């Protein structure tokens, strides 16, 4: 049995880099179209009105307005409520 490790062996792997996941815009905050609302793995939050979902499950605003969180059928939804003043 060898008392030394092989030439190409390593002393354990290293920890991975943090992915900066989480809610980026909170309820009541004003956002512009295209702004990222939530970065997530899987659909912890689901897209609601005026919210899109990217390939990596990132939720983003499709229109400008205020962020609103709600629940429907045990799903947490993220909606964008448009301002009437902005449209006029």
Swiss-Prot record:
Alphabetical UniProt keywords: Ribonucleoprotein, Ribosomal protein
Pfam families: Ribosomal_L27 (PF01016)
Gene Ontology CC annotations of this record: cytosolic large ribosomal subunit
Molecular function per GO: structural constituent of ribosome
Coiled-coil regions listed: none
Residue numbers spanned by region Disordered: 1-23
GO biological process: translation
Compositional bias segments (type: Polar residues): 1-13
Gene3D superfamilies in alphabetical order: 2.40.50.100
NCBIfam families named among the record's database cross-references: L27
Family indicated by similarity: Belongs to the bacterial ribosomal protein bL27 family.
The protein's name in its UniProt record: Large ribosomal subunit protein bL27
Primary gene name: rpmA
């Amino acid at each position: 049995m060898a008392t030394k490790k092989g030439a190409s062996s390593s002393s354990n792997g290293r920890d991975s880099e943090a992915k900066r996941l989480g809610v980026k815009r909170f309820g009541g905050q004003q956002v512009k179209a295209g702004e990222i609302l939530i970065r997530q793995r899987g659909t912890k939050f689901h897209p609601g009105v005026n919210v899109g979902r990217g390939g990596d499950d990132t939720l983003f605003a499709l229109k400008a307005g205020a962020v609103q969180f709600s629940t429907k059928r045990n799903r947490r939804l993220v909606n964008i409520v448009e301002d009437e003043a902005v449209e006029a």
